[in-house]
């Protein structure tokens, strides 16, 4: 017999003052996740969820819009100060940082957590355009 699952309320308003913003910027998209200090997600957004498609997802403007959206949702839960962890080589890193600061969140530290291979896997071949 299948057990009944207990479901948590999804949009329940939390009161969290400090958190961590994880900015994952790849060559194709930029994702922003704002979590509490333990790592539980508070809000998230990406360039794709903001309505950008294809190569427009990788633009700095799309990253800015996604960061503003995630920051607004986090501020609804009482978020005031954040640490920022930036990951990836994409073009949306700087603009996402600026958008988080402009949204009214107080940034205490910025950390680059991009994984660096110590001669690991062979990288993809060069593009011939």
From Swiss-Prot:
GO terms for molecular function: rRNA binding; structural constituent of ribosome. InterPro entries: Ribosomal_uS11, Ribosomal_uS11_bac-type, Ribosomal_uS11_CS, Ribosomal_uS11_sf. One of its GO terms (biological process) is translation. The keyword Chloroplast does not apply. One of its GO terms (cellular component) is ribosome. NCBIfam families: PRK05309.1, uS11_bact. Located on the platform of the 30S subunit, it bridges several disparate RNA helices of the 16S rRNA. Forms part of the Shine-Dalgarno cleft in the 70S ribosome. Part of the 30S ribosomal subunit. Interacts with proteins S7 and S18. Binds to IF-3. Belongs to the universal ribosomal protein uS11 family. This is Small ribosomal subunit protein uS11. It comes from Cereibacter sphaeroides (strain ATCC 17023 / DSM 158 / JCM 6121 / CCUG 31486 / LMG 2827 / NBRC 12203 / NCIMB 8253 / ATH 2.4.1.) (Rhodobacter sphaeroides). The lineage of its organism: Bacteria, Pseudomonadati, Pseudomonadota, Alphaproteobacteria, Rhodobacterales. The gene is rpsK.
